Amino acid sequence: MIISEMQRKLATWAATDPSLRIQRLLRLITQPEWLAEAARITLSSKGAHTPGVDGVNKTMLQARLAVELQILRDELLSGHYQPLPARRVYIPKSNGKLRPLGIPALRDRIVQRAMLMAMEPIWESDFHTLSYGFRPERSVHHAIRTVKLQLTDCGETRGRWVIEGDLSSYFDTVHHRLLMKAVRRRISDARFMTLLWKTIKAGHIDVGLFRAASEGVPQGGVISPLLSNIMLNEFDQYLHERYLSGKARKDRWYWNNSIQRGRSTAVRENWQWKPAVAYCRYADDFVLIVKGTKAQVEAIREECRGVLEGSLKLRLNMDKTKIPHVNDGFIFLGHRLIRKRSRYGEMRVVSTIPQEKARNFAASLTALLWKVRISGEILLG
C-alpha cells in the first residue's frame, strides 16, 4: 500500500462529498505499512528521546520495534489496546508562568500518529481557509501576512477595530462529548471512535498521582492540535455564515446600499449600517477586524462569547479579549501590528516584534553563546 495515495483518496472523497462519513479507518491504520510509517515519523522526531510514564525511550523501542508494532496491531484490532496516562511536565512561558505538557508513551505516540495520518486528509477540506494553526504548509507568517492584507484596504477615516480573541486554557477545557460529536460527522467507524475516546480519556500522571481527564486534550499529544482545530472549526463556520461568506457580504452590501440611497424601507425602519468583518485564527488565537462603530464591535465580541460558551462550552477571557483601534496597535501571535502613516503620506500596516519578546530572545541567545564559549559546542534540546 502506498500511504500517500491512500491519503489523497481520503482527501478527495471528503472534498467531493461534505456529508460523507468514512468507514473502516481502524482497519486502515492497523495495516503494517501504515503503523511502520507512523513509527518512523515518531522515532525521527526530536522528542523521541523523551520517554513517557513507562520510561521507554527511542533506543529501547528501536531494539524491539518489529515485535512492538505487531503487539500494537493485535491490541488495536482486538480492542484490548489501552493508552497509558501522559507524563505531565511543566515548561516556563515568557511571562514567567508554567505551561503544562502531557508526554505520552512512545507506543501511544505511534498510535496517535497513525490516527493523525488518516484524519488530517479528511478534515483539511473542511477547515476554513482563514485557519492557519497546525495545518500542512501553513505557518504563523502566513497568518500575519493575511491579517496585514485584511488591514491594507482601510483608509484613515474608516473605523477599524480589532477583537483580540483570548480563550481561557483552551486545550484543557475542550468538551469531550462535543468533540466526539464533531468527529462523528466525518467518521462512522465505531472501533476507531472507541480508540479516540480512550485516547482523550487516558489522563496524566502529575507528581506521581494519576489524574483522570474529564475534559481537555493534552498539550504535547500528537493528535491534540488536529482535535483542537476540529473543535474550533465549528466557530469558524459560524463566523463564515454570519459575516464572511459571499452571501453574507452581498446581503451586507445590499443593506448598506439601501441606506445610502435613502430607500423608503431603510428610512422607515431606521436601518443601521452593518459592519464589515474580517477574521483570522491560529489554533486558539484569533482576531476579528471590524469596520464599524465601537458599539458594533462590542456587540460582535459578545456574540462570539455566546457562541463559544453556549455551543462549544469554551471560555472567552473577556478581560484579555480587548478591542484596540488599529491606529493604536494590537498583538497577534507574538507580533505587534499597527497602522501608521508613511513618509509619503500613505497609511500602511507595520508588524514588529514587541520589545519584551525581543529582550527574551536576546537573553536566550546570550545564554546559548555563553554555553558555546564554555563547552565548545552548542547544546541542543
UniProtKB/Swiss-Prot annotation:
PROSITE patterns membership: RT_POL (PS50878)
Pfam families cross-referenced by the UniProt entry: RVT_1
Name listed for the protein in its UniProt record: Protein YkfC
Coiled coil: none
Residues annotated as binding Mg(2+): 166, 284-285
InterPro entries to which the protein is assigned, alphabetical: DNA/RNA_pol_sf, GrpII_Intron_Splice-Mob/Def, RT_dom
Keyword flag Manganese: no
GO MF term set: metal ion binding
Keyword Lyase in annotation: no
Record domain Reverse transcriptase: where: 72-337
Family stated for the protein in its record: Belongs to the bacterial reverse transcriptase family.
Organism for this UniProt entry: Escherichia coli (strain K12)
Note: Encoded by the CP4-6 prophage. A short reverse transcriptase-like protein missing about 140 C-terminal residues compared to orthologs.
Name of the gene: ykfC
Entry keyword set: Magnesium, Metal-binding
